[in-house]
C-alpha cells in the first residue's frame, strides 16, 4: 500500500501510451485464384475470394492496427464499394495503413498474427513472411499458423482465417 501511494505522488512529465488492437479476417477459398498469405504468393495452392487479394493475414494485421489506433476497421478504411481497391494487395493495404498511422502521430510497436487453415504449409516460409511484413511496417512482426483439426470451415478446407494483434504508441 505504501508503495502505491508513493507511485501516485510521482509526476509524469512525458507520457507514452501503448495501445493494443485485435482483429480477425476470414475468406472462402476460390479455386484457381492466386494464394496470397502474409504478403507472399504460394504457388500451386488455391487462394481466397474477396474484393482484394484475399490475404487473410495482411487483412487481419491492417484491422488490428486500425483498432489499436482507434481509426476504424478495414471496411471503413477501404470499403467494398470502392473500385480503386478492386484486387488490392495486402502489401499495399499495409503500406497505406502504416502511412495513415504515421500521419496521425502513431508509431507501430509490433504486430502478431496467426493463420488458421489446412493449406498452405506455412512453416517453411514463416520467417520470410515475418521479414516482409516487418520491412513494410518498420516494426517487428511475429507469425504462426495452426489448423482446427478438420473442424469448421477452415478444417474442411473451405476457407482460411487469421487473428492478429497490434501494439501502437502515441505521445
From Swiss-Prot:
Protein's UniProt name: 2-C-methyl-D-erythritol 2,4-cyclodiphosphate synthase
Protein's organism: Corynebacterium efficiens (strain DSM 44549 / YS-314 / AJ 12310 / JCM 11189 / NBRC 100395)
Annotated 4-CDP-2-C-methyl-D-erythritol 2-phosphate binding sites: 25-27, 51-52, 73-75, 146-149, 153, 156
Keyword entries, A-Z: Isoprene biosynthesis, Lyase, Metal-binding
Signal peptide region: none
GO BP annotations listed: isopentenyl diphosphate biosynthetic process, methylerythritol 4-phosphate pathway; terpenoid biosynthetic process
Role, per record: Involved in the biosynthesis of isopentenyl diphosphate (IPP) and dimethylallyl diphosphate (DMAPP), two major building blocks of isoprenoid compounds. Catalyzes the conversion of 4-diphosphocytidyl-2-C-methyl-D-erythritol 2-phosphate (CDP-ME2P) to 2-C-methyl-D-erythritol 2,4-cyclodiphosphate (ME-CPP) with a corresponding release of cytidine 5-monophosphate (CMP).
Pathway(s) per entry: Isoprenoid biosynthesis; isopentenyl diphosphate biosynthesis via DXP pathway; isopentenyl diphosphate from 1-deoxy-D-xylulose 5-phosphate: step 4/6
Name of encoding gene: ispF
